[in-house]
């Protein structure tokens, strides 16, 4: 497990564990979400992410350990909607209730002014859909309405569980811009995902879990630095070139099994110059770019590795005869959102 200490925590998990009968969902999980960060909570499906988020929010009682939100247990916060906005599932919207009425109901429940409902519709770009029933909304529109609900209390923290699921690229881009703008206002985001590439462009920190345990936490900058591009060099005397490079301060050098050396932190021109000075002939050089998604998969590999010849797991298999592909979900366009803390976004509504 690799752990890097960071700034003060908006959210802190301390030894969280959860046992569901014979299933150990989370085991001794500890991590922090720094204040003002966008932290990606990453892991394969079934790795304990949703259970952990629900424990943080007091929706599931942990078997062991505890957690803190802004320094205190969540259940002790007097006005939780003003501290934490939660986006767990957009399927809980009443299909016969309009977007505006939905927000008014929740505004009344948490004790904020009725006018806040219209403001939040404007914030997420749903003003023109205020009088439409939620049951007619596309997945992207439902997700925006769920975010508007979470924002009613003007929270300091947003917690989102797999918010990109089912969204098309335009919807994902809108969500990314929205969360970046929220964090730029000095607030904190914890967003879960089973794919690093979905959140890589917006997160500043990552917490990676597998089988309900921590495998990595730290900043994205540190993760990128640890897996930066390398120059793979084939030459007449690898050992001599490595020694010459080390003398110039280039120490990220690895001897590969095929006789080449992998060099980090030096550009081709520098390596060529050092090789010439050391009287080493370079036969070829190629830059190896590291795919962070592959790094993430390596961290979490093995969680669901299938046994050879195992076929379908019990209860799973081909659908019975007569079941076709699911129908396409209609995507209704809406006007572009306007987000006051960083200005209008480019492009249209969700899909």
PLM features per residue range, with description:
Residues 1-17, 302-351:
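ABC-family P-loop ATPase nucleotide-binding domain
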Residues 6-210, 216:
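ABC transporter nucleotide-binding domains
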Residues 35, 99, 220, 289-292:
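Structural motif detector for alpha-helix initiation sites
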Residues 81, 227-228:
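Short Pro/Gly-enriched coil loops immediately N-terminal to beta-strands
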Residues 108-111, 204, 250, 297, ...:
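Non-catalytic alpha-helical coupling and interface elements of nucleotide-dependent molecular machines
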Residues 214-219, 245-249:
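Short amphipathic beta-strand starts and helix->beta connectors
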Residues 221-225:
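Short acidic-hydrophobic catalytic motif
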Residues 228-302:
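Short, charged/small-residue-rich alpha-helical element at the C-terminal edge
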């Amino acid at each position: 497990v690799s752990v890097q200490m960071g700034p003060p925590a908006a959210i802190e998990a301390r030894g969280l564990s959860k046992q569901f009968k014979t299933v150990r969902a989370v085991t001794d999980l500890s991590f922090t979400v720094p204040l003002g960060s966008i932290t990606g909570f990453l892991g394969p499906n079934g790795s304990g992410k949703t259970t952990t988020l629900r424990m943080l929010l007091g929706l599931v009682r942990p078997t062991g350990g505890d957690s803190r939100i802004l320094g205190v247990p969540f259940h002790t916060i007097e006005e939780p909607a003003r501290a934490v906005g939660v986006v767990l599932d957009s399927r809980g919207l009443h299909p016969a209730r309009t977007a505006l009425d939905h927000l008014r109901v929740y505004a009344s429940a948490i004790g904020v002014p009725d006018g806040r409902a219209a403001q939040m519709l404007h914030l997420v770009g749903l003003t023109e859909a205020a009088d439409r029933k939620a049951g007619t909304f596309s997945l992207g529109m439902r997700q925006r309405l769920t975010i508007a609900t979470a924002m009613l209390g003007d929270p300091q923290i947003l917690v989102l569980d797999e918010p990109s699921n089912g969204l098309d690229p335009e919807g994902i881009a809108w969500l990314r811009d929205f969360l970046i703008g929220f964090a730029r206002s000095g607030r904190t985001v914890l967003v879960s995902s089973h794919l690093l590439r979905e959140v890589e462009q917006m997160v500043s920190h990552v917490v990676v879990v597998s089988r309900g345990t921590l495998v990595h936490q730290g900043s994205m900058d540190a993760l990128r630095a640890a897996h930066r591009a390398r120059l793979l060099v084939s030459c007449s005397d690898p050992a001599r070139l490595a020694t010459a490079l080390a003398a110039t301060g280039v120490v990220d050098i690895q001897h590969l099994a095929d006789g080449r050396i992998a060099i980090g932190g030096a550009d081709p021109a520098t390596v060529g110059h050092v090789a010439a000075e050391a009287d080493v002939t370079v036969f070829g050089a190629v830059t190896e770019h590291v795919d962070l998604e592959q790094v993430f998969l390596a961290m979490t590999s093995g969680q669901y590795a299938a046994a050879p010849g195992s076929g379908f797991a019990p209860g799973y298999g081909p659908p019975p005869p007569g079941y076709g592909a699911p129908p396409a979900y209609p995507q209704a366009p809406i006007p572009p959102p306007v987000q006051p803390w960083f200005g209008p976004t480019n492009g249209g509504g969700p899909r």
